[in-house]
C-alpha cells in the first residue's frame, strides 16, 4: 500500500500522491420567478377597444366568421374598433409565386381580393347592428403588397388602392400607413413596429427584447 524511500533525513510516502478523482455534484438550478402585481385602475369609465388582427381575407374563404365577429363586437360595445393590419391577404399581388409558375397562375385577380374584403365587411356590419364605435385601420404588410404592385406599375397607380380604401373610408374608418402608430389614450396600435432603418422588428427574441426595450409607451401589434 505504501512505497517509501527512506534515509536518515526524509521519507516519501507514495500514498500521499495517489490520483484523486474529483467528485461531481449535480444540483438543480431553479430560475427565480419575479411576479409583478397587476396595476389596478381607478378609472370609473375605462375606454373599451376591440381589436381585429390579421383576418387574411381571401376570395376562396367562407367569410361567415365575420358575422360572428360583428356579433361579438356588438356584445362588447367598444368605444373604438381597431384593425391592426392584414385584413385582406392580397395574394393577387404576392411576389413569392411568379405569375408564370403553376402556383402563380392560381393567384386571384386583384378585384377578387377587393370584392372579398367588401363581402367580409358587409357581414361584419350586419353582426354589429346599430352600434357605431370610432373605427381605425392600421395597414399591414399584406396590404402593402397592393401599394407595391401599383408602385411598380405606373399605369394603375391608385386604381386599386383607392377602391380598397373607399370600402373602409365610406363607413368612417380612419387609415394609417404601414408602420405608423395610431394612439388611443397613450396606447399605440400598429401592425408591426419598425426599427430605425424602416425594417420590421421580427423574430421571437427580437420581439421580446427590442420592442420592450425601445418602447416608451404600451404597444398593441399583430
Locate each region found by the language model.
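Hydrophobic transmembrane alpha-helix bundles
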Residues: 30-40, 50, 118-128, 163-183
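Contiguous hydrophobic segments
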Residues: 10-33, 113-116, 128-133, 188-221
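Acidic, histidine-bearing metal-coordination/catalytic regions of metal-dependent phosphoesterases
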Residues: 1-52, 59-60
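Core catalytic region of metal-dependent phosphoesterases/phosphodiesterases
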Residues: 57-170
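Acidic, His/Gly-enriched loop-helix segments that form or flank divalent-metal centers
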Residues: 147-222
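Active-site neighborhood of phospho(di)ester-bond hydrolases with catalytic His/Asp-centered motifs
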Residues: 51-53, 80-86, 134-140, 189-192, ...
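Short alpha-helical segments and helix-capping/turn motifs at coil-helix boundaries
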Residues: 34-35, 64-69, 204-206
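Flexible, charged surface loops at secondary-structure boundaries
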Residues: 43-45, 74-77, 129-130, 182-184, ...
